[in-house]
Amino acid sequence: MKTIISFLLLIFIFSCSAPKEEQLKKQVKRYASVIKVKPEKLDYYKELHANPWPEVNAMLKECNIQNYSIYYRDGMLFSYMEYTGNDFEADMKKMAADPMTQKWWKETDPCQEPVESAEEGEWWAGLEEVYHLE
């Protein structure tokens, strides 16, 4: 009987201290952005992303990015990602300083051009979220 009570007490303690699903969801920040792809570079861009460099994928994960996707339609690339870290700016600086990521961008950047509405210095233009369903 003492063992059962101890076991139930342990379960209660762990269930109270474990992060709730709602808390975990709140830690995820969603980002979407858009950029043009040059028509003559589309096939090369798709080829690169069909076989992404493992080091680049590892850096994305190391910088707290998950569930990252890029879609294409009518000359436009649309990206979606989820960020789970605590300092987005620091993680983006870390990624930008990574030598393999820099090499990757030297391959992908010539394939792209900012949309007309991009802000000064903005490459991928951030999008406003207008709806989300949990």
Feature-to-residue mapping (PLM):
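Short, glycine- and small/hydrophobic-rich beta-strand elements in well-ordered beta-sheets
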Residues: 57-78, 82-86
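C-terminal motif of bacterial Sec signal peptides marking the signal peptidase cleavage site
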Residues: 13-15
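Active-site-flanking beta-strand signature of metal-NTP-handling nucleotidyl enzymes
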Residues: 31-36
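Bacterial signal peptide processing site
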Residues: 17-19
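An amphipathic, aromatic/His-enriched active-site/gating alpha helix that lines ligand/cofactor pockets
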Residues: 63, 84-123
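Sec-dependent signal peptide recognition
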Residues: 2-7
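Short amphipathic alpha-helical segments
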Residues: 41-66
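Short, flexible turn/loop "capping" segments at secondary-structure junctions
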Residues: 23-29
